[in-house]
Amino acid sequence: MSKVRERIYLTKDELKDIEIDILNRRHIERYAMIRQWLWGNVIDVSCGCGYGTHLVSNNPDITGIIGIDISEEAIEWANSNFITDKCLFLKQKIEDFDIKADVLISIETIEHLKDPHILNELAERTQVSEMFISYPSKKTTHYNKHHYRDFIDDEIIRIFTNFKLVDVIDLHREVRILKLQRYVSSI
């Protein structure tokens, strides 16, 4: 007969490793969650080291995906580890990117931007039809020096003037993913 484990005996180091693993899995989960809705040519804004870009590129509905980031080190890592015939990684500022696409994804980026309106300008320049914007749904600026501000859904929706909210995904009550679609003109 198997004994029921009522206690978990861990060291501080083991506990820290588990916590880091959970955080890593949750970051990956955000990409895994949205990839089912992606299609055509996709832009991954602030793609970091490229794991999320690569993960979503496995969706057969995606023609190609470009991950952009301002970190040369991150882009070098992405190009060394995740480049495929569908994935391209570029060291580029959001303000300078202008390749047309169908969908834009921005996973935990908007709170890092001094001016979040540059994402709207990017959406207009690239003429995307849909966007997936994720952000922390709790206050983070008091402990994360890289976050310029905290957001609520309405504030983000107001930034994207030509888009409407069509869906909200709430992950673990700590991150929200907004699915936005461009308004279609009836003219």
Enumerate the predicted regions with their spans:
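Conserved N-terminal segment of class I S-adenosyl-L-methionine
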Residues: M1-F97, I107, H117-E121, Y143-K164, ...
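A short helix->loop->beta-strand "cap" motif at the edges of active sites that frequently abuts
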Residues: I62-T63, Q127-S129
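Short, Asp-centered acidic motifs that coordinate Mg2+ and/or phosphate
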Residues: V103
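Residues lining the SAM
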Residues: I107-I110, S134
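Helix-to-beta-strand junctions that scaffold the AdoMet/dcAdoMet cofactor pocket
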Residues: L113-K114, T126-V128
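Conserved beta-strand signature within the Rossmann-like core of class I S-adenosyl-L-methionine
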Residues: V128-P136
